[in-house]
């Protein structure tokens, strides 16, 4: 019996059943039976009928296999599950029961489009005439007019979501920056992302050397007892060759980024960071004239992947973290030597569960990166790391950095840069508020995770960035795109 009353449980169960069937080699036979296993009937649980519920599961299975949920595929990692959509109201402004049907009719007077008319018990808004300007809501002395909007549309920082004639959400692939916030915010789970769990499992079964690259934001996501060593032990039990901290790539990126920043600063040029793919997508799609200002340094994920492949050209590298945009970096940017796949926490946990492996408490004995590399998962972490490296190498330029925390701040900073009014020398952009720890696929709320995370990181040794990088052959691979 599967608990389909929670969207989180529904997502996890679909991923688990697909992963289990993939390991057992029965996915082709099981694919059409999974919806019936999960939705037994005869009574529906969360939709109008069991057939719609099963169709939702069916489309989620397609996403789990890396396909679009329907027949059409626009190539976007983020997809609308149409069978799960259309339950949200389209009308942006509605008159609530708080309306006193007063004689003043300030709402009607405030509307310039004739969209409001008096009703028998309260005013009425004609959605065909309403321009969603909000003047009626501001004018009402009883605050009786509410602004009701879809969570997916509200969460999108680049206005990439609209609706079709049936009220189903539509993602504009040309605008979408793949941040994944819409998928996280939809309370019906009507937006999801493609996964590579079947590909990863196929490579594990084929005996390939598969390496996990674990995001620095992971520490704190699963409580203080689940350490990097916990993850390392778990993925090795599943069949991975090893696990490497992406924070090590943060140290590597820091060195290269510092060199770029110093060169640009001395030449009077401005730059942006390149490690957040959501931020990079925002620049390329919405501020294309600034694309040349993006740092050419590869992301920490790519740096670690290149390091691994420099030693073992046949290695398969898999990023694991709370980020949806990392999937876009893998699928869309096609950077040589980058990670082959990217998984979120639910996806890697589904793979573990399919092999009866659980994350278990372990002493935090495993450390690849410096504390600064670990803080790459926080907004401002890149800046702090680069400035620390400059200090260690005695390059004390008075560099000013705009730390853009979240998509809204990124847009503001880029607008200033575009107009030549940015006072700082560089922009560190993080599309998710709080940084990677606020990613849409996070396992824990930001405030709670941050407290645990800071405690865990304090227990790490305080090695210097320059000393840490001496352990690795940095000349065996390139740090640039």
Language model features by range: what are they?
Residues 71-96, 113-114:
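N-terminal [4Fe-4S]-dependent radical SAM core
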Residues 86-94, 117-122, 163, 181, ...:
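Gly-rich Lys/Arg/Thr-decorated short loops/hinges at beta-loop-alpha junctions or inter-strand turns
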């Amino acid at each position: 019996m599967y608990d389909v009353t929670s969207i989180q449980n529904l997502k996890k169960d679909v991923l688990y059943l697909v992963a289990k069937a993939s390991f057992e080699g029965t996915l082709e036979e099981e694919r059409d039976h999974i919806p019936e296993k999960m939705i037994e009937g005869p009574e529906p649980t969360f939709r109008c009928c069991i057939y719609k519920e099963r169709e939702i599961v069916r489309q989620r299975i397609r996403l789990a296999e890396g396909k679009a949920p329907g027949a059409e595929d626009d190539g976007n990692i983020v997809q609308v599950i149409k069978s799960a959509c259309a339950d949200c109201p389209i009308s942006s402004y509605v008159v609530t029961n708080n309306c006193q049907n007063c004689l003043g009719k300030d709402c009607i007077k405030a509307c310039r489009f004739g969209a409001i008319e008096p009703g028998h018990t309260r005013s009425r808004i004609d959605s065909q005439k309403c321009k969603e300007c909000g003047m009626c809501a501001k004018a009402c002395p009883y605050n009786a007019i509410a602004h009701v909007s879809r969570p997916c549309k509200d969460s999108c920082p680049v206005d990439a979501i609209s609706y079709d004639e049936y009220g189903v959400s539509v993602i504009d692939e040309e605008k979408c920056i793949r941040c994944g916030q819409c998928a996280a915010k939809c309370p019906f789970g009507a937006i999801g992302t493609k996964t590579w769990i079947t590909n990863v499992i196929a490579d594990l079964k084929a005996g390939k050397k598969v390496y996990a690259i674990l995001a620095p934001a992971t520490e704190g996501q699963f409580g203080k007892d689940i350490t990097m060593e916990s993850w390392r032990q778990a993925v090795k039990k599943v069949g991975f060759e090893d696990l490497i901290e992406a924070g090590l790539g943060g140290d590597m990126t820091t060195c290269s980024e510092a060199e770029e920043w110093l060169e640009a600063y001395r030449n009077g040029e401005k730059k942006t960071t390149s490690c957040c793919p959501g931020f990079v997508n925002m620049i390329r799609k919405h501020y294309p004239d600034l694309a040349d200002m993006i740092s050419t340094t590869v992301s920490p994920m790519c740096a670690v992947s290149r390091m691994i492949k420099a030693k073992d050209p046949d290695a398969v590298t898999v990023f694991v973290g709370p980020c949806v945009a990392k999937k876009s970096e893998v699928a869309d940017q096609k950077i040589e030597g980058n990670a082959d796949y990217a998984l979120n926490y639910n996806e890697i946990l589904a793979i573990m569960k399919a092999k009866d492996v659980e994350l278990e408490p372990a002493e935090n004995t495993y450390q690849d990166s410096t504390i600064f590399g670990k803080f790459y998962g926080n907004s401002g972490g890149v800046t702090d790391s680069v400035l620390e490296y400059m200090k260690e190498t005695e390059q004390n330029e008075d560099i000013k950095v705009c730390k853009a925390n979240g998509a809204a701040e990124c847009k503001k900073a880029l607008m200033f840069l575009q107009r030549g009014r940015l006072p700082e020398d560089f922009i560190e952009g993080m599309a998710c508020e709080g940084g990677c720890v606020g990613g849409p696929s996070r396992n824990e709320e930001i405030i709670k995770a941050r407290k645990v995370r800071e405690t865990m990181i304090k227990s790490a040794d305080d090695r210097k960035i320059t000393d840490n990088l001496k352990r690795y052959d940095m000349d065996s691979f390139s740090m640039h795109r």
